[in-house]
């Protein structure tokens, strides 16, 4: 009796695990990742590298003198920052481009890290929220430097 009870429990557990993905509604499957509001008094910056770009060279992102992180392929990073202006740079294998941004409390902004001309350079380009959210949903998260302000 105990053996059959254990077998039934194991079978039901396996069935429940297998159905977990299928139990999501169409809305949940379509929405994907949740975009949390920035922390109180902070702004959220998303830095994204798109997978449609065939160039796989490293792009290093810095803010002032601090490294934010490196994007080697498709992925995204989120940085929560207090309101201020920031000097962001995207470094390719040969050079970099600067982008100075001003952020306000409560806002979320999206930036695309991409290769630029001449070859070996990289740049950050601000994109609209719907496009940024779509790209974030398609890519894995890459954790950024936790010691940033």
Regions found by a protein language model. Give the residues of each.
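Short loop/turn and low-complexity linker motifs enriched in small/turn-promoting residues
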Residues: 17-149
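Sec-dependent bacterial lipoprotein signal peptides
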Residues: 1-17
């Amino acid at each position: 009796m105990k053996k059959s009870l254990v077998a039934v429990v194991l079978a039901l557990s396996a069935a429940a695990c297998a159905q977990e993905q299928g139990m999501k509604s169409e809305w949940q499957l379509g929405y994907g990742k949740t975009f949390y509001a920035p922390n109180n008094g902070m702004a959220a910056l998303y830095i994204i590298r798109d997978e449609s770009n065939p160039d796989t060279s490293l792009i290093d992102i810095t803010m002032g003198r601090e490294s934010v992180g490196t994007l080697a392929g498709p992925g995204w990073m989120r940085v929560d920052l207090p309101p201020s202006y920031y000097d962001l740079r995207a470094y390719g294998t040969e050079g970099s481009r600067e982008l100075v941004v001003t952020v306000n409390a409560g806002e979320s902004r999206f930036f695309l890290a991409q290769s630029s001309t001449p070859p070996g350079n990289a740049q950050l380009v601000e994109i609209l929220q719907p496009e940024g959210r779509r790209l974030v949903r398609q890519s894995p998260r890459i954790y950024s430097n936790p010691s940033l302000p």
